[in-house]
């Protein structure tokens, strides 16, 4: 079968390669991939050439499919079930994070479809979910409810991230306002979570390149206002829209240093920033404001079983909308077109399906 693989250790590019179909062990589950989505985490390796031919991983950690095989010792899953993976492949099972069910904060975690794994990912025909993870973490897989299709289920990862950031990590109360910085899937699902939870003003901050595609979708999904950070004073505009006493929560999804600076500045005293986006440059500004005005910066990583259980119910109920965000549906053989669309921001979410003849 074909698979889109990454090569090199720290950074490296992608190649479409031939790989054998995974062998199902006695405790394993093999999924036939029905839909896989390109994530922002996949983009950092696109058009990168490390000069290395060392295999790293089959990519694609946002995927859903149908169980094709189960090992003889597997009791909880059956061939034919429609499932979505939370992309856990390995955790230690004994650290404080694992004991709390926060498996993706395990320092020994290995994710399916991400770096340095041998089990596989969504950018192929089949992916193996190892029995070792299913013994520790049964909810490494979730059954897809009736009425939810594969492409919607494939993007439950960012939905669950948005759920956890607002519903579980922040102290948000209905009737307050929320600013979301960033217009990718994490940002747009955060808009929907803020709407569901009863925010009055939901302000989305983006850039000039978001005006054509992403701003209109943000409004369709519940944003009450958009702010163009390329042409407007972000802090002043957000405070003007919300009023200085109502802006208690900023969900920062871009990872840009300037965005974190703006988020801290615009908050009212005792406000919170949940930092969902990840940047790679040292901070170049003072954060004394968080001490002077009792503001909080909350780090965010992934989700837990509560996030998944409730996000799946919201998706099945129709409260969460995915279709407006799926801008491209392509075969895996056209993967470069999908990545290019992500680069130029004509895409929000790209869904790929396996289209190679065996």
Swiss-Prot record:
UniProt xrefs under InterPro entries: ADH-like_C (IPR013149), ADH-like_N (IPR013154), ADH_Zn_CS (IPR002328), GroES-like_sf (IPR011032), NAD(P)-bd_dom_sf (IPR036291), Zn_alcohol_dh (IPR050129)
Assigned keywords, A-Z: Metal-binding, Oxidoreductase, Zinc
Requisite cofactors: Zn(2+)
Binding site for Zn(2+) 1: 39, 61, 157
Cofactor note: Binds 2 Zn(2+) ions per subunit.
EC nos: 1.-.-.-
Record flagged with keyword Nucleotide-binding: no
Binding site for Zn(2+) 2: 92, 95, 98, 106
Pfam families on file: ADH_N, ADH_zinc_N
Molecular functions per Gene Ontology: oxidoreductase activity; zinc ion binding
Enzyme class: oxidoreductase
Superkingdom of source: Bacteria
Family the UniProt entry places it in: Belongs to the zinc-containing alcohol dehydrogenase family.
Name used for this protein in its record: Uncharacterized zinc-type alcohol dehydrogenase-like protein YdjL
UniProt source species: Escherichia coli (strain K12)
Gene expressing this chain: ydjL
